[in-house]
Amino acid sequence: MALVKAKPTSPGRRFVVTVRNKELHAGAPYEPLVEKKTRKGGRNNTGRITTRHRGGGHKQRYRVIDFRRDKDGVPGQVERLEYDPNRSANIALVLYRDGERRYIIAPRGVSAGTEIVSGVDAPIKPGNALPLRNIPVGTQVHCVELRPGKGAQLARSAGANAQLVAREGRYATVRLRSGEMRQVLAECKATVGEVGNSEHALRSLGKAGAKRHKGIRPTVRGVAMNPVDHPHGGGEGRTSGGRHPVSPWGVPTKGHKTRSNKRTDKFIVRRRKR
């Protein structure tokens, strides 16, 4: 895996930096694990925009990922690594001994031919999934569940990891990349190691069109809008907005806390760093 800087043969190529991974499968995905994906353009069922800056982009198909890792005790072998347009991490196609194939998030250090397994007796090596109560304290993990059997929810993107820092009674404490320390039920599963493709953060799309290919539309500044559209809008000539930065709905955007889920506050041991 290497970063490749494009030659400036045109203005659109001048700033392009891509990640080249020769281990990735060049062909089509495994068809039984591919589903149709309908684009919503950021709209909900009433047709109103609920997520801004979405729309257009290349047609994509969804790869069904095994986030539960519930095939306990059945060894599997990684057949190949693949690109997934739906996430920053790469995915691995695993062939299990009973003949079933599943996609998993590709951990760092896992390649074609690597043996993986899940379950309480799984060895502590990258790619193996087991409950937090069976993982040694200090181990780096990813794809961490928040509820047993629900499937991985934490540390799933490229280069992500969490560290198991303590275990007491029914709960284990994990430290996330954000600095947040959180208690999770020790029965929840996690995968050993960190997510691969960490170079994803270093790439540069190089031009606006590449963003559009991904289905991301432009972000318009509030000061460039009219007063009816944004609190920073309007004024004669160019203005600074005239107030502290806020969202289109008047919520402060710099340093203002917006977390409102009080029900799970008790599980957060330490807040994330600002």
Swiss-Prot record:
Record's keyword annotation contains Secreted: no
Biased composition, class Basic residues, residue ranges: 50-59
Record has rRNA-binding as a keyword: yes
PROSITE patterns named in the record: RIBOSOMAL_L2
Coiled-coil spans in chain: none
GO cellular component, one term: large ribosomal subunit
A Pfam entry, by short name: Ribosomal_L2
Region Disordered, annotated ranges: 38-59, 223-274
Domain of life: Bacteria
Subunit structure as annotated in this protein's UniProt entry: Part of the 50S ribosomal subunit. Forms a bridge to the 30S subunit in the 70S ribosome.
Similarity remark: Belongs to the universal ribosomal protein uL2 family.
Task performed by this protein: One of the primary rRNA binding proteins. Required for association of the 30S and 50S subunits to form the 70S ribosome, for tRNA binding and peptide bond formation. It has been suggested to have peptidyltransferase activity; this is somewhat controversial. Makes several contacts with the 16S rRNA in the 70S ribosome.
Protein name, as recorded: Large ribosomal subunit protein uL2
Organism whose genome encodes this protein: Alkalilimnicola ehrlichii (strain ATCC BAA-1101 / DSM 17681 / MLHE-1)
